[in-house]
Amino acid sequence: MKTKKQQYVTIKGTKNGLTLHLDDACSFDELLDGLQNMLSIEQYTDGKGQKISVHVKLGNRFLYKEQEEQLTELIASKKDLFVHSIDSEVITKKEAQQIREEAEIISVSKIVRSGQVLQVKGDLLLIGDVNPGGTVRAGGNIFVLGSLKGIAHAGFNGNNQAVIAASEMLPTQLRINHVLNRSPDHIQKGNEMECAYLDTDGNMVIERLQHLAHLRPDLTRLEGGM
């Protein structure tokens, strides 16, 4: 009885080109052989003489740079195809470390004085003041348990969902991602903690901290970090 050969590659056509779903359990050599066989049998053309974009999905497989190059060269050997992207569900240790750092809440107890810059990759919890001329920067959110009278820049790595909160909100400048607000025309009422965030139109808004409960529900993770 003849054994049916295992299919290691599934090809699906989309409006953006072709998507190749590659088996993540077989060996890399078996994968290349399976892909070579499929590409030699099938003919792919858009009917207009233009190259077709190929999106490769690796699943739970990690490829070294040399292996990615082999895969890309094999697909590109078909004159009508070119590799647009290669996606894997597996991340490197460096990427995992970066994700961990960006999600980490860094707690610092100090006064940030004029000319000083305090920067963290994740969220910043500052127990102390930011004096005029002082700067705090975070890839995530900024929480100041004290007076914010200097500059605060949250979400500097492109995070529009970041917020800035302070016990006393009197900054010379607020910035979330690339949105800048110089010396906000705002007078804090009472002693309630306030926060700044970007609304759905990308405008900076300053509200009482309680408003964040429904605007940024994921911030409840701070309960475990404080």
From Swiss-Prot:
Keywords: Cell cycle, Cell division, Septation. The keyword Amino-acid biosynthesis does not apply. Coiled coil: none annotated. It comes from Bacillus subtilis (strain 168). HAMAP family: MinC (MF_00267). Belongs to the MinC family. Cell division inhibitor that blocks the formation of polar Z ring septums. Rapidly oscillates between the poles of the cell to destabilize FtsZ filaments that have formed before they mature into polar Z rings. Prevents FtsZ polymerization. The MinCD complex plays an important role in asymmetric septum formation during sporulation of B.subtilis cells. It comes from the Bacteria. InterPro entries: CAP/MinC_C (IPR016098), MinC (IPR013033), MinC_C_sf (IPR036145), MinC_N_1 (IPR055219), Septum_form_inhib_MinC_C (IPR005526). Interacts with MinD and FtsZ. GO terms for biological process: cell morphogenesis; division septum assembly; negative regulation of protein polymerization; regulation of cell septum assembly. This is Septum site-determining protein MinC. NCBIfam families: minC. Pfam families: MinC_C, MinC_N_1.
